[in-house]
Amino acid sequence: MSRVGKMPVAIPNGVDVTITEEQISVKGSGGTLSVAQNRLVKIVNKDGKLSFEPADESREANAMSGTIRQLVNNMVVGVSKGFEKKLNLIGVGYKAQASGAKLNLAVGYSHPVNFDMPAGITVATPTPTEIVIKGADRQRVGQLAAEIRAVRPPEPYKGKGIRYSDEKVTIKETKKK
């Protein structure tokens, strides 16, 4: 059996988990998230913990038990604590400004780059060179951060661009004659 799938998911106070034939829904202070139920995984809710077991002994069922367990765990953590990604802008004149559900970037192009935030995602700019993305859905937070980073990824010679706050950019040496 999958090692990840063997671990139960603890449900904290204030989080409600609803399991139906079609989907698994998690509701908490951060909102409501749901994932499609998989026929290869049996879910048992006892004593405030969810256990995930493969429905049969196939490799696919074993793999899906770990996958569904981690998706449900991410939903439980998301609706209770939330997820956040931090981005830094490095470069002369590079700046970001968040206004409501919009993010405006000035990153060296002849035009500003605008992003509309999807529902359930908030963005803040504590400083003009720092972006903080928060939300309950881990996948959407990470995907939005990746899309913003893709506007101007860090270049290898000077390190200018948009990078994750914990990202290390290896600087290359320039060619010598």
From Swiss-Prot:
InterPro entries: Ribosomal_uL6-like (IPR000702), Ribosomal_uL6-like_a/b-dom_sf (IPR036789), Ribosomal_uL6_a/b-dom (IPR020040), Ribosomal_uL6_bac-type (IPR019906), Ribosomal_uL6_CS (IPR002358). The keyword Hydrolase does not apply. Coiled coil: none annotated. GO terms for molecular function: rRNA binding; structural constituent of ribosome. It comes from the Bacteria. One of its GO terms (biological process) is cytoplasmic translation. Disulfide bonds: none annotated. GO terms for cellular component: cytosolic large ribosomal subunit. Keywords: Ribonucleoprotein, Ribosomal protein, RNA-binding, rRNA-binding. NCBIfam families: L6_bact. Part of the 50S ribosomal subunit. Belongs to the universal ribosomal protein uL6 family. This protein binds to the 23S rRNA, and is important in its secondary structure. It is located near the subunit interface in the base of the L7/L12 stalk, and near the tRNA binding site of the peptidyltransferase center. This is Large ribosomal subunit protein uL6. It comes from Paracidovorax citrulli (strain AAC00-1) (Acidovorax citrulli). The lineage of its organism: Bacteria, Pseudomonadati, Pseudomonadota, Betaproteobacteria, Burkholderiales. The gene is rplF.
